[in-house]
Amino acid sequence: MEVRTDRSFLLPVAPATLWAHVSRVEHFQDWWPWLRRFDGRALAADQRWGCTVQPPLPYQVRFTIDLDEVEAPVSARGTVSGDIEGWAQLRIGPHVEGSDVRLTAELAPTNGFLRVAGRLAAPVVRFGHDWVLDAAVRQFRERAL
């Protein structure tokens, strides 16, 4: 089961201000309690972030993000590997109300349990994925801005 994401949302700060907040990687686990492990040092090209995510389901997802391209304050694109693999991209653009943020990704499970779960219970896997994204945006607004 491949999970594709194409989401856009508005945040009430200018792109440069938003980028300054997003670049504070040392605060990620404070903002996002479901991010159980994070060892990233910077939002910069050629960085590797190790992550463990706990959705509201009885499993954790462990993966790394290799930041391939980073263009401040506009975009970051990374290759994902581990329990899931694929790519993800964050793009930030100006909007009259602040910043237009777009997240796109194509991810697929490599872990045997997640592959089986994706085949047998695709809506549950999608729920977990969507829950993490929804929580991330909500908690970023509440805790980072």
Question: Language-model features: where?
Answer:
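A short, structured loop/turn motif at beta-sheet edges
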Residues: 15-16, 42-45, 68-73, 91-100
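Short, surface-exposed charged micro-motifs
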Residues: 8, 39, 66, 87-93
